[in-house]
Amino acid sequence: MIFILLTTLLAVGGAQTANILAVLPTPAYSHHLVYQAYVQALADKCHNVTVVKPQLLDYAAANKQRCGRIEQIDADMSSQQYKKLVASSGAFRKRGVVSDETTVTAENYMGLVEMFRDQFDNAHVRSFLATNRTFDVVVVEAFADYALVFGHLFRPAPVIQIAPGYGLAENFDAVGAVGRHPVHYPNIWRSSSIGNADGALIEWRLYNEFELLARRSDALLKLQFGPNTPTIRQLRNNVQLLLLNLHPVYDNNRPVPPSVQYLGGGLHLTLEPPQRLDIELEKRLNASVNGTVYVSFGSSIDTNSIHAEFLQMLLDTFAKLDNRTVLWKVDDAVAKSVVLPRNVIAQKWFNQRAVLNHRNVVAFVTQGGLQSSDEALHARVPMVCLPMMGDQFHHSAKLEQFGVARALNTVTVSAAQLALAVGDVIADRLAYQLRMTNLLNVVAFDEATPADKAIKFTERVIRFGHDITRSECSLKSPSANTDYSDYFVRFPL
């Protein structure tokens, strides 16, 4: 009787239970905060989700019962490999910067692709693949083109790509959106979007590097899954939808077809309200009458490999802020290897949302990551950004443009400049908070929550996904996955 009632309610609501496969291999903690929220939202809508993922977060852990099931397939070797990859990036590192356009090459990124290969060769994953199960849709991490092979292995299920923030140019190309422009829509790997000849050359070089990376990935795919495995370009044809966890205003209001959905950002903030700080730390912050500055460069930066001179610059900055408490998220080994100024509390981990929501936290020195900036915006804490990799350069520049942060040059910044920037955002804190409120009003204007929007379009792909040969069922534009030589040159006669 209960089953019949539940089935009836689902039918009336326009949704039916679906079996969903999510392949989310990159072991980056902040990314999985977003993916966890998405998967749990699917389960809350009574969908059954099987997740191939590293052991970072327990997606099934929750304080409530869900009508859908979450099954986790652990690719557990990947977290250690990923740390090794980040650590090895020191060979290409500039002062304080892990990765920019000069280090984004096919050669450097093959280590990441090989990590995906090894994850999918994991005993847990091989055992799962041997079950020959069927799914209604396959959701794949947008940064991991190698994982598109799961759309082939579980065909004819349509494919959705999801990103915790910005999309890659290749993601946009796959679904027929505007993927590239050196000025208006710069590649997210660039550290500057200045529109000059150098910018155009960088765009062209990045395009060629990712084409080479795709060809090398093709060779690995055929070795791992058989000689008849489609190429990356062919696998992209299966992608029907791209979900991006940010508001389009950050992406310069890029012109996109409905196959690209900007969720608005802050998806992970829907999981649960901020937790309370531990008692001792809360006492310290309560006593910080001149304010506390929180310093964290995110979960992907290995502070053990921070350039020594950059590390000293940070310590000199903290000393200049001697009338304020500084909370510094840093590995224990680093904290023990230096002489900390008396105003610094150094720990390997802080509950970031709880810290930012404390009334005495007055500034946030950050790498400019999307999840961190979402948390700071909601807490109304002005930011000073020191971007270090990937989309952080572009995102930091946008935050400064909107008047909610200062963005500094990580390679050249001095202790005096950093201390001055921190002092400026604190002195002008009320104006920063007003601009943060205005930005949040824009971002939150859509009545649908990020989770609701993600579920709505996921369910649309599930419903119409097997009819994609009918043009009225597709969300993509006719230019989807078209080679640029055809896109610009070839016309019907």
Curated annotation (Swiss-Prot):
Domain of life, source organism: Viruses
Function (record text): Catalyzes the transfer of glucose from UDP-glucose to ecdysteroids which are insect molting hormones. Expression of egt interferes with normal insect development and block molting.
Gene Ontology MF terms: UDP-glycosyltransferase activity
Signal peptide: 1-17
Family: Belongs to the UDP-glycosyltransferase family.
Pfam families linked: UDPGT
Protein name according to UniProt: Ecdysteroid UDP-glucosyltransferase
Keywords annotated in UniProt: Glycosyltransferase, Signal, Transferase
